[in-house]
């Protein structure tokens, strides 16, 4: 579609036609770099775990950029350090998601086709442009689904931890815990809730 319609068709996929490029990510990084001030000064709504990871990531960004007034948040492209930090973080998360998808129980050819189809689908391309932490949460949500019916107790527990971690980043993945209740796996649901509370509090 983009090849047929040209540049205007391509950028129409993105938020505000690409004029707010990657700003979910950069705004969040700038907010989280304030530490506790992210809540007291910036009034952010991200859960603590998400802000902790964003704060750690902010350590890679030039302090000069992080300290600029809010109206200059979109000037990240003037800072080579900010560009390189973003590219490295994005590449790491992208690779992690690809590796998780390649664990799907299909033939090698189907796994590769699935990975390419998912990672280059329209919703994911839009998600890349926003740079939102939902991408990271989705990785752990997929791990939960992959291990849900595993015969290994360790794998199932890893799945529960992954669901709890996903919920500690974005909250709404917690709704997938309803699957445990539907299958009457109450003990596992209880442990998942405990994991989630600990990750939210700690």
Where are these regions (language model features)?
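Membrane-interface transmembrane helices that cradle and orient dolichyl/undecaprenyl
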Residues: 134, 141-157
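Membrane-embedded alpha-helical segments of multi-pass membrane proteins
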Residues: 88-93, 135-140, 166-172, 193
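Membrane-interface alpha helices of multi-pass inner-membrane proteins
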Residues: 156-181
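Short acidic/glycine- and proline-prone juxtamembrane loop motifs at membrane-interface regions
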Residues: 126-134
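Structural signal for the C-terminal ends of transmembrane alpha-helices
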Residues: 95-105, 145-151, 181-186
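TM-lumen/periplasm interface segments of multi-pass membrane proteins
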Residues: 1-109
């Amino acid at each position: 579609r983009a090849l047929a319609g040209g540049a205007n068709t391509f950028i129409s996929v993105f938020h505000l036609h690409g004029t707010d490029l990657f700003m979910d990510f950069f705004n969040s990084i700038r907010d989280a770099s304030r530490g506790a001030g992210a809540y007291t000064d910036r009034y952010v709504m991200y859960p603590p775990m998400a802000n902790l990871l964003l704060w750690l990531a902010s350590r890679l960004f030039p302090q000069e950029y992080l300290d600029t007034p809010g109206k200059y948040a979109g000037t990240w492209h003037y800072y080579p350090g900010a560009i390189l930090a973003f590219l490295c973080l994005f590449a790491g998360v992208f690779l992690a998601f690809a590796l998780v998808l390649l664990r799907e129980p299909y033939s090698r050819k189907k796994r590769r086709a699935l990975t390419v189809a998912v990672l280059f689908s329209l919703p994911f391309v839009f998600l890349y442009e926003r740079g939102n932490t939902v991408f990271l949460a989705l990785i752990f949500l997929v791990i939960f689904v992959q291990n849900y019916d595993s015969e290994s107790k360790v794998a199932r527990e890893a799945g529960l931890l992954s669901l709890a971690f996903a919920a500690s980043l974005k909250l709404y993945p917690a709704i997938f815990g309803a699957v445990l209740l539907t299958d009457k796996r109450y003990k596992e649901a209880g442990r998942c809730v405990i994991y989630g509370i600990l990750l939210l509090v700690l």
